[in-house]
A protein has these predicted regions:
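Aromatic-anchored glycine-rich loop motif in surface-exposed flexible loops
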Residues: 1-63, 79-84, 88, 94-95
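An aromatic- and glycine-enriched ligand-binding surface/loop that stacks and positions planar moieties
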Residues: 39, 43, 47-50, 62-167
Length: 167
């Protein structure tokens, strides 16, 4: 989503140049927009996506209305627009997403989980690969073939490891 990327820009820079037309027509002298205008742009962009994307999560991994409204809610928290964040969150909560039962905790990580609002799904039989697992190994560990430089970003702390029961 364009609104998702602009959320990241606004979090970092507060003021951004808003490109809302065909990239072939971009002018080099575009003015910097105010932070308020930037958040209005994000709001309108993600609200439009929420209104026009399908609610149904099948096929797995497809962007949905729920994903757009979840992103909108989070963006409006950063913008300190509390009512807009609440309204978007209520839309997501009304779409059938649920937390997985404690007894079925592992289901939260499976494709099609009722807990997943936006989920990457991979098929072992396809040729589509990823290096996400490289983020979960200690830095410098050669978990992947080639020159992956991803190690360590998602490595859990010892405190987190100890919070789980041992098998």
């Amino acid at each position: 989503f364009r609104g998702y990327l602009y959320t990241d820009l606004l979090k970092r820079y507060k003021e951004v140049i808003i490109y809302d037309e065909d990239l072939d027509n971009i002018k080099k002298d575009m003015p910097v927009s105010s932070e308020a205008d930037g958040w209005n742009f994000v709001y309108n962009d993600l609200k439009y996506a929420g209104e026009h994307l399908p609610v149904d999560k099948t096929p797995n991994g497809r962007l949905t209305s729920g994903a757009a409204y979840a992103m909108l809610s989070r963006a409006m928290l950063y913008a300190e627009r509390w009512d807009d964040a609440r309204i978007a969150a209520e839309k997501v909560m009304g779409m059938g997403y649920e937390l997985e039962a404690k007894e079925d905790y592992s289901n939260a990580f499976k494709a099609g989980s009722k807990e997943a609002i936006l989920q990457y799904c991979y098929d072992k039989s396809s040729t589509v690969t990823h290096d996400f697992d490289g983020y979960m190994v200690p830095g410098g560990d050669k978990a992947l073939d080639g020159n992956s430089m991803t190690g360590g970003f998602g490595t859990p702390t010892q405190e987190m490891v100890e919070s789980y029961e041992y098998a």
